[in-house]
Amino acid sequence: MSILRDSGRHYEWQYLDLMRRIWEHGDERVDRTGVGTRSVFGAELRFDLSDGRMPLLTTKRVYWKTATREFLWFLTGNTNIRPLCAQGVEIWTDWPLDRYRKETGDDISRKDFSARIVADEAFALRWGDLGPVYGKQWVDWPVFEPVGDGLFRRREAGVNQVADVVDSLRHNPGSRRHIIEGWNVAEIDRMALPPCHKTYQFHVSGNRLNGLLYQRSCDVALGLPFNLWGAALLVRLLAQQCDLQPGELVWMGGDTHLYLNHADLVEAQLSREPEGDPRLAILRRPDSIFGYRIEDFEVTGYAPQGHLSAPVAV
């Protein structure tokens, strides 16, 4: 059991404590986006995942189905936003939209851009690709083989890190190499956004599977609620596929920040108190970790407080 749950304190207080620490004591910094942040370096959160528990925030609505659709898209290795837009998921739309506007001078609306991505395959191929982001590295990390005379060629099939972790958890649970890495130095420049939630590691203790996520850069107000859900979901899926019980999720942040233009959201959220104990049920066990569908997931006991919004920094 998590020490936080044993103490009787609601799991979400640690998130709110981190938010308050950053907002009240963080260093103000000029960041890549030009928006400005308050930031701390080095943070840790821990969540109990037993009995269906998930780190789903209650002090604002977190759209867990949207986060799940994004996560399942990662597992496909797809890097084009078209499948996401077709499901109404706009998490990644702002980056291709920004590039399209800059290169064409067309001040198209986000809604119209997304609709065109869905309707026009050629347009999506030209403007909807993000480069070799997250899922591509997770399931198709490039491998180069020698062909003689000091030359190399890319192997058709790359490394499927997710499949390798499933295999190692099943056959060598005591290994310290259960890792999924997204930070491919050679391909960073080709990515619309370098991976923020970059390194996942897994640990088996008895029949319990624990997971750790290291995040190099973390937007606490908008990104972290989705990142926590995705990391916990990955632990849950791996546990089910490997006949283990979910244990604990440990989250570690590097540059952990709040954007200055998120002030209204931060102050509203810090005025609220967490409540409830949502649980996630996985309704089906497919033959592979790559076979899950959105219909396989059901959340109960989730009654979040009102929606809070803020702009995304691109």
Swiss-Prot record:
Q: Where does dUMP bind?
A: R32, R176, R177, R216, S217, C218, D219, N227, H257, L258, Y259
The organism that produces this protein has a lineage beginning with: Bacteria, Pseudomonadati, Pseudomonadota, Alphaproteobacteria, Sphingomonadales
UniProt similarity note:
Belongs to the thymidylate synthase family. Bacterial-type ThyA subfamily.
Q: In which pathway does it act?
A: Pyrimidine metabolism; dTTP biosynthesis
Q: What is this protein's function?
A: Catalyzes the reductive methylation of 2'-deoxyuridine-5'-monophosphate (dUMP) to 2'-deoxythymidine-5'-monophosphate (dTMP) while utilizing 5,10-methylenetetrahydrofolate (mTHF) as the methyl donor and reductant in the reaction, yielding dihydrofolate (DHF) as a by-product. This enzymatic reaction provides an intracellular de novo source of dTMP, an essential precursor for DNA biosynthesis.
* One cellular component term from this protein's GO annotations in UniProt: cytosol
Which Gene Ontology molecular function entries are recorded, alphabetically?
thymidylate synthase activity
User: What domain of life is recorded for the organism?
Assistant: Bacteria
Catalytic positions?
Answer: C196 (nucleophile)
Sequence positions that bind (6R)-5,10-methylene-5,6,7,8-tetrahydrofolate: D219, A313
Which keywords does the record carry? Cytoplasm, Methyltransferase, Nucleotide biosynthesis, Transferase
Enzyme class per UniProt: transferase
Q: Reaction catalysed? A: dUMP + (6R)-5,10-methylene-5,6,7,8-tetrahydrofolate = 7,8-dihydrofolate + dTMP
Q: Which Gene3D superfamilies match?
A: Thymidylate synthase/dCMP hydroxymethylase domain
What's the protein here called? Thymidylate synthase
Q: What species is this protein from?
A: Novosphingobium aromaticivorans (strain ATCC 700278 / DSM 12444 / CCUG 56034 / CIP 105152 / NBRC 16084 / F199)
Give the UniProt record's GO annotations in the biological process aspect: dTMP biosynthetic process; dTTP biosynthetic process; methylation
Subunit structure, per the record? Homodimer.
